Structure formats: structure tokens, C-alpha cells
């Protein structure tokens, strides 16, 4: 049990310094004993010790014992990165009755021993500098208290693909009211377009549709389709969200999905669900298993002949329907916006969009699907005949620095082999060739799937990225490539070429990212707070990531991450409140002139002007210090990193006499 905290700031600093060996990480390079003895001579240092692992229970107990017996009111631990163990040591000193913010970390591992392994003497001197600077700051530390904010027990899931569906179901099953916003007329995401899933070749819609139905019928889920998030204000526990629901021109409450309106509509248009290779009507139901099972009118094609209105017995057609603005308040947000397939038209050498029989992997998926535009038949777009020779090209839009996409999309190798196998199942006499750079069969059952492609199906693999695809007068295609295993240039003719396109962030993701205030990684996908320790969290508290929104992944990984995001989002909602760390910016209202420079620069929107001076919302502030550095009047300061504390560290670093 923690003892009652002391009134530390009015007392003379009594500092304890604890130098950690971190096994051989620090102790194998730095002379720990020399650093320990040096620290003991610094002003206000009462005790200086070393131990092999201070993060261990015995190490922490030693620190707590000294706090109680020696009356320490400041603690400095010289060890690894505060990103790893600062919470550990804060908790340690707090349990001994000391305010957790009267603790300072000196990083002797990442900032010293790991970067100076070849210079032990220099590393030891640098360790002394780092400890001296930490002690200088520790003298000026102030006790701080965390604040708490209440958390609304409702959640918002953005995106209706398999990741969004899993997240929403998990949260709803926990008892939380969950809003799901999907920009398309129906949920399903990309998984709904697939015929089979690798490596088990399960029917994609067979395993997805029951979950879609569960979403539509769940008492705790409010499904808002054909809609987009337009504004997000607030902070963890108290987000205010504005959603724009586009007009379907069909009343969802009245429509039964009977399809009568679709039958009588005289206007055809490209079917987006079939990737444009099939046609649908100007009034359409995206696919038979759609949730909600409701028609939508596309006004870009509708001629308002009113035949749909006349045939509808329930009067569900509403040609005068207007966009609807919906406002909700939620405690947490999960972003599961999925991906778009790379558009290969910029790869001019492959002729997509110019060569009739060059198609993408997703277009082939719709061909292979029994409910697709060709009723499951694989045909050449040029003449509708079955192809006798088919080539697949891997890594189109992936692992390609020339187009700014150096990352691996992680699913292309497997979905190409899956579709190659399905073609052989449908047309055993068809020759299938795969052009690849490397086969990345990393998942459970993937290597066996790869071997089956070679051994059972006799699919040919050529290692090399094709240089170009040429269209011949008879509309066959010549693929010119280097075979890197044979060390020669090859040219082979095919009836159809399928481009294995990679995954890219979906259209509109950048606008949504800015609306919510998230970061993105170099590949354009949304960035997690930490790739290993916080893979579903973001730097915006209360906002989480699921599925391909965070980066390319297959269906099992997307579902697993979705459940992880739901579990993380549930934590603050279960607790009903969250603790806000007090390392935030503060304003001296007597000095602030209300110039608003800080407002323009704050990346988290945490500052507003109230009564003529800046006011910081501590729930939004992340303590980045941007406003402090920019304030022209010096009115902004940051708790735990106050100007006088930083200056004390600088002076200690430059103090040659102390060295």
C-alpha cells in the first residue's frame, strides 16, 4: 500500500541515484562503479547505488527501502529508455509514498552504451554527463497530480469490412452501444468480393455473411451505411462526431429488398461491386447478401422515369430525399477503413487500360466468383472465350520504389497462387505462369499452399519482374521479362495477363486522418502508437486501429487485430474514466497576449482562447512542447519540462568543472 505522499517541494532536495547494469547492455560497456561513485559526489545526492537489474522486484524494493529510511524526496534511475520502464519506476516510487513525478530517468542504454560500444571510456564519461544532467533537473522537479475525465460508454467503428464487423460485434457483445459507419450502401468490405480465401479455400461470403447478418440484427449496433464521418471534436471519453448520410432515394425502413425496382429500371451502369467489368441498374442492390438489404438509386445515371416508384408496393422510393446530418457522442473510436487496390494504369509498361486482356487480380476475383458478372467463368475480355495461357505478375504496386511504394502488401503472393489454382480447377488444360520477385509464404499453411501450386497443379514459376507487356494484332499478349534464375531474357505469349496489384490506403483516408488527428507512416497507412507494444493504439488517446487501415495484412490478421482493438477500446469504457497525465502545457494568463500562435501550431487542437488568453485542454494536450517553443511572450510553459528545468540540464551538460 502506498503511504500518504509527502510535501516534497518545500524541502531541501534529498536525491537517490540508482545506476542499472541492465545485464551487459550497459554494464558491458560503461564502468558502472565509476558512474555510481561520481554521482555520490553531486550536490543533494544522499545515496548512490548500482544493481544488475533495477526493473526487477529486488531492485525496486531497494529503491523503496531507501525512500522510506533515508527520507529521499527525489529519485534518479540511470538505466534504459524511459519509453520502456518509466511507468515501472513511477509506480515504484509512488508505492513508497513519493509523488511519481519526483522521479527522473537517465537513459544510459539507447543514448550511450548501445551507440558507444567501441569506446568504453567515452561511454563512461558520457554516462556521468547524463547522470549529472538528470540530477540537475531532479532538484527542480515538482509534484504533479493526474486529472480524470469521464468516459462515455459508446463506441464508433468507421468502416464495414471484416475488421470493422469483428470490432463492432466484439464491442456490442461486451454490452457497449456501437455505431458503425460504412461509406458504401452495404457492409462487407473487400472480403465480400472474393470467391475463396487462402489457404483453406473457404467460400468467402459463406463465412462473412453470418457476421454481416449479426451486425444488422444486433441490439447494441446502430448501422449507418452510405455515410461518411465529416467532423470529430473532443477527446477520449467525450468525442462529438458529425456524420453525413448520403441520400439513397430509397427509404431503408420501408424497403424489403425485393428487387422489383431493379427489374423495371431501364438504365444500366457499371457495377462497382464487380470492379466495373459487369453492369447493374441505376437502381441497384449491391449483392444478394447485402446488409442492409436495401436498394439505392444512383442519381448520376437515373433518368427519373418513375418506373421504380410505380412498381414499389410499399412506397419506399423517395426521389426528393436529402442528405442527413447525424451527430453522435462516443467514448472511443476504432478506424477500420480497409484499403483500395492499387491502380496499375500508371505502370505504363503493363498496358492496363490499353491492352484489352490485361486485368487486375480483383477483377479476376469477380470473374471467378459464381455470383460475379460471368457466373464464375474465366473469360478473355476481348472475345468472351476461355484463355488457354494465363500469366500472373506479382508485386504490381508493391516493392516498387520507382512509384513510391517500397512496402510488401503481404497478401499478393498468396491470392495470386489461390487464383491460379482456381483457374486450374476450372480449366485443367490452361497453362498458368507466375512471374515473381520472391514468394513470401509466411503464414500458417502458406508454405504448403505454395508447394501445392507447384506439385499438384503444375503451375510454372518464373523469377523476374516483367519489363513490359506488348499487345499483338490478334490481341494476345507478349510478356518480356528476365528470368533471374536462368540468367536470360524471356518472351512468352499469353491470352490473358493478370496483374497482382498491391494494397494502398483507401480514397478519402487522408481527409479522415486529418479530421481525427492521426499520424500516418511512410507508406500512407495510419500509424500505430508503437509497432510492438501498442499496435492497435494511436497517438490520439481513445482512437484505435483495426485491419488494413494500419497496414497490409490478410484476413486472419485483420480479424485478430480487430478483436484486439475492441478489447483496447473497451478498457476506458469499462472503467468509466481515464487518468490524464499532467505533463501538459500551462499558460501564464498575466503574460499571455492572446496572439494565437500556439493555436495555429498545436497538432492536437488542444488550445483555445478564453477571456483573452490561451487555455489548454489537458485531455487533448500531449505535452509535445510545440507551443512552449513558439510562444513569443514566454507565457507558455510545460509541466515536468519547465524552462528552468531544461536550462538546469543544459548548464549541467556544459559545466566543465563538474566533469
Swiss-Prot record:
Binding site for FAD: 159-182
UniProt-annotated binding residues for [4Fe-4S] cluster 3: 592, 595, 598, 631
Listed pathway(s): Cofactor metabolism; coenzyme M-coenzyme B heterodisulfide reduction; coenzyme B and coenzyme M from coenzyme M-coenzyme B heterodisulfide: step 1/1
Entry binding sites for [4Fe-4S] cluster 4: 602, 621, 624, 627
UniProt cofactor note: Binds 4 [4Fe-4S] clusters per subunit.
Pfam families: Fer4, Fer4_10
This enzyme's EC code(s): 1.8.98.5
Required cofactor(s): [4Fe-4S] cluster; FAD
MF annotations from Gene Ontology: 4 iron, 4 sulfur cluster binding; metal ion binding; oxidoreductase activity
Amino acids binding [4Fe-4S] cluster 1: 255, 258, 261, 312
Domain of life, per lineage: Archaea
UniProt: [4Fe-4S] cluster 2 binding residues: 265, 302, 305, 308
GO annotation terms (biological process): methanogenesis
Ranges for domain 4Fe-4S ferredoxin-type: 245-275, 293-322, 582-611, 612-641
Catalytic activity: coenzyme B + coenzyme M + 2 reduced [2Fe-2S]-[ferredoxin] + 2 H(+) = coenzyme M-coenzyme B heterodisulfide + 2 H2 + 2 oxidized [2Fe-2S]-[ferredoxin]
Keywords: 4Fe-4S, FAD, Flavoprotein, Iron, Iron-sulfur, Metal-binding, Methanogenesis, Oxidoreductase, Repeat
Subunit relationships: The heterodisulfide reductase is composed of three subunits; HdrA, HdrB and HdrC. It forms a complex with the F420-non-reducing hydrogenase (Mvh), which provides the reducing equivalents to the heterodisulfide reductase.
Function summary: Part of a complex that catalyzes the reversible reduction of CoM-S-S-CoB to the thiol-coenzymes H-S-CoM (coenzyme M) and H-S-CoB (coenzyme B).
Family membership noted in the UniProt record: Belongs to the HdrA family.
Protein's UniProt name: H(2):CoB-CoM heterodisulfide,ferredoxin reductase subunit A
Organism for this UniProt entry: Methanothermobacter thermautotrophicus (strain ATCC 29096 / DSM 1053 / JCM 10044 / NBRC 100330 / Delta H) (Methanobacterium thermoautotrophicum)
Taxonomy of the source species: Archaea, Methanobacteriati, Methanobacteriota, Methanomada group, Methanobacteria
The gene coding this protein: hdrA
